[in-house]
Design a protein with these regions (language model features):
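N-terminal intrinsically disordered, cationic/polar leader segments
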Residues: 1-85, 89-137
Length: 137
């Protein structure tokens, strides 16, 4: 285990509008506000969602696209200087849930985010063993 203590800087409550793509919107927000570390939580509703699942064994992602109305029951993410890494859980109108790494999500109703920004910058480094860009602590 590795850890790094960071000081909280600011907290934001963010409303992402209908038709906006969440990663694009949050990336711009973080760039505009010079946020290079932090975490986020959120909920909402989306109509276009691309999720992925990573296999450590093959070092490849499998991907699936979901369309139509879906509740976004959970968004959790880590913000670093290189990217925003979010995992999402969504539910369809049959109450089936799907979860994974978020590649794309277009909001269809609303999206509400609580973002906790860190005062320091956190980076990522490629880990050869897993094939993932992991936190550089």
């Amino acid at each position: 285990m590795y850890q790094k203590e960071i000081s909280p800087s600011k907290q934001y409550i963010i409303k992402i509008n209908r038709g906006e793509e969440i990663l694009t919107t949050l990336t711009k927000f973080c760039q505009d506000n010079q946020i290079f570390s932090g975490s986020l939580l959120g909920i909402g509703a989306a109509g276009e969602i691309d999720l992925a699942h990573y296999s450590v064994a093959t070092k490849q992602y499998s991907k699936q696209t979901f369309t139509g109305e879906h509740e976004v029951t959970s968004l959790t993410g880590i913000i670093t200087d290189k990217k925003i890494h979010i995992h999402a859980t969504i539910a369809n109108n049959q109450f089936q849930t799907f979860a994974g790494h978020l590649n794309r999500m277009v909001i269809s109703g609303a999206c509400e985010i609580h973002l906790l920004a860190g005062a320091e910058s956190i980076g990522r480094l490629l880990d050869d063993e897993t094939g993932l860009e992991l936190l550089a602590l």
